[in-house]
Design a protein with these regions (language model features):
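The feature encodes the CheY-like receiver
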Residues: 63, 87, 110
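Alpha4 helix (beta4-alpha4-beta5 surface) of REC/receiver domains from two-component response regulators
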Residues: 69, 90-106
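Acidic, metal-coordinating helix/loop segments flanking the phosphotransfer/catalytic sites
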Residues: 37-55
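Short amphipathic alpha-helix used as the core "switch/output" element in two-component signaling
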Residues: 46, 68-79
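Two-component/phosphorelay signaling modules centered on CheY-like receiver
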Residues: 18-36, 101
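Acidic catalytic/metal-coordinating carboxylates
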Residues: 40-43, 65-69
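C-terminal output helix
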Residues: 93, 111-121, 128
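The short loop immediately C-terminal to the conserved phospho-acceptor aspartate in CheY-like receiver
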Residues: 17, 61-64
Length: 136
């Protein structure tokens, strides 16, 4: 686990596969957005409870706890970050469940980085005083 710098936005990237997390980190870092990573749902919840996380990107199929299980547990917290859910098996049922739990966005895997960055920019603008790094 990586500790966040409180002066910037922090995005949680949670998936057991490291490759896309590293790519997203490299894309967000120049924007002034820091990332913290978790390899399973339990680590994701621990980071959400211990760090100031502004948005959480969660894989629906993670070990220990899946992304929707994490979202359900986050909703019981006092101040949970908005979530973006990634899935390689998008179904109407999953989409309905995710939207019912107020997931901000559901994206298919493999991850389209442009869509993910756009979703992150929208979620940070919406939930954090319309501020995206570089906005005037």
């Amino acid at each position: 686990m990586v500790v966040a710098n409180p002066k910037r936005f922090t995005v949680l990237l949670s998936d057991e596969q490291d490759g896309w997390q590293q790519t997203v980190h490299r894309l967000l870092q120049p924007q002034g957005v820091q990332t913290v990573t978790a390899r399973n749902g339990r680590e994701a919840l621990d980071l959400i409870q211990s760090e100031m996380v502004h948005a959480a990107v969660l894989d629906a199929q993670m070990p220990v706890l899946g992304g929707m299980q994490v979202v359900k547990m986050m909703r019981e917290m006092k101040s949970a970050p908005p979530a973006i859910l990634l899935t390689s098996h998008l179904t109407d049922h999953l989409l309905h469940e995710a939207l019912g739990m107020h997931v901000f966005s559901v994206l298919s895997k493999p991850v389209d980085f442009n869509l993910l960055l756009d979703s992150l920019a929208r979620v940070l603008r919406r939930y954090h005083e319309n501020r995206w790094p570089g906005d005037g």
